[in-house]
């Protein structure tokens, strides 16, 4: 379970970094060269999703819970935005959903 969660966390970071670098280029006028590491990060994100031993749709569904929590961590650390009570309440709910799906994929 820990290995799966850590893999999901690294996967989420790759997705967020790739999207963030693209966002910097579009919204903040960053150099077009930022698209190269963005593309590499997004390619790594896709590859990491293939490392799970479950059907792709199930992996994507479970990954969503960890993505939500990672995005909230990014919001706080990188964007410098304080988390709200709704963020703090929603994150554990998302993780519970991920946990239910991951535990279940070993039993089907």
From Swiss-Prot:
Domain of life of the source: Bacteria
Subcellular location: Cell inner membrane
GO cellular component terms listed in the entry, alphabetical order: plasma membrane
Topology within the bilayer: Multi-pass membrane protein
Annotated transmembrane regions: 6-26, 31-51, 61-81, 85-105
Keywords of this entry: Cell inner membrane, Cell membrane, Membrane, Transmembrane, Transmembrane helix
Cytoplasmic side stretches: 27-30, 82-84
Residue ranges that the UniProt entry lists as topological domain Periplasmic: 1-5, 52-60, 106-108
Pfam families, alphabetized: UPF0060
Family: Belongs to the UPF0060 family.
Alphabetized PANTHER family for the sequence: UPF0060 MEMBRANE PROTEIN YNFA
Protein name from the UniProt record: UPF0060 membrane protein YnfA
Species whose genome carries this gene: Salmonella dublin (strain CT_02021853)
Lineage of producing organism: Bacteria, Pseudomonadati, Pseudomonadota, Gammaproteobacteria, Enterobacterales
């Amino acid at each position: 379970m820990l290995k799966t969660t850590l893999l999901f966390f690294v996967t989420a970071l790759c997705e967020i970094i790739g999207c963030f670098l693209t966002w910097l280029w579009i919204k903040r006028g960053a150099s077009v060269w930022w698209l190269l590491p963005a593309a590499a990060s997004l390619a790594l994100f896709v590859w990491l999703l293939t490392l799970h031993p479950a059907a792709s749709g199930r992996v994507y569904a479970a990954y969503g819970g960890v993505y939500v929590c990672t995005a909230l961590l990014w919001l706080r650390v990188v964007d410098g935005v304080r988390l709200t009570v709704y963020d703090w309440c929603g994150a554990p709910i998302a993780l519970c959903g991920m946990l239910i799906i991951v535990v279940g994929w070993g039993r089907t």
